[in-house]
């Protein structure tokens, strides 16, 4: 039973969506025309009629009418017609509104959390985006009245879906082409801005002097400094002579190690000056490579 109920609910939702699409796509021109004409008529009434005075006039007219009928009927008939034939119970507005209010209250904490994060700049990027959006809305509503915006939105709601559905492929191709052109233009403008600002940045860097060098040395990636060091150490390791490999001898009786016939050679003296010169040369090469990588 639960599965059938869920299936029926899904069908109802799909039918509602299809009805809304059919309404906006003018599948039934008579029904769509009624809604479109009614919305335009309501907007024209809102523009021409002062709603506050209108509702006040309707309210005091109803009260004067019901009071007069009740008084006259009690005076001549002995019983008030309004109290006799009027509704005895009020419509259950609270029961109708309560589910919607409960659903809205469930979503309220999430909305409050988003507002708190935005106001207190937990993510500054999102805060700036929201500020820019509110600024644009402020300018937009200062240029146009609310009635004009609602009137244009109503016309677009009943015309744009039908136009897009009729020329979908052409509109999609045009939008994709416009996006590509905008990307190219933004890249060109960014490159132009970089080229124009480069001389000023170079001047600032030259004026700062050692401060800019210090910042570069701190912000340089580790890989750029590790590369020359490993290369120089590998060069130093290549310059150092390796010890000769010892010959492997088998334990068989046929192959025996030869007895040395000559006297052992004397040990060579260790020259400290040559070693210090080599170390100085290697450090100079390392400094040159580091300067080239930083430049």
From Swiss-Prot:
Could you tell me which residue ranges the Reticulon domain spans? 20-220
Q: Which GO terms describe its biological process?
A: endoplasmic reticulum inheritance; endoplasmic reticulum organization; endoplasmic reticulum tubular network maintenance; endoplasmic reticulum tubular network organization; ER-dependent peroxisome organization; nuclear pore complex assembly; response to bacterium; response to endoplasmic reticulum stress
Ranges facing Cytoplasmic side:
1-50, 164-295
A Pfam family (short name) is Reticulon
Which sequence positions carry the modification called Phosphothreonine? 186, 219
Renumbered to this chain, region (Disordered) spans 219-295
Q: Which InterPro entries match?
A: Reticulon (IPR003388), Reticulon-like (IPR045064)
Q: What is this protein called?
A: Reticulon-like protein 1
Q: Which organism is it from?
A: Saccharomyces cerevisiae (strain ATCC 204508 / S288c) (Baker's yeast)
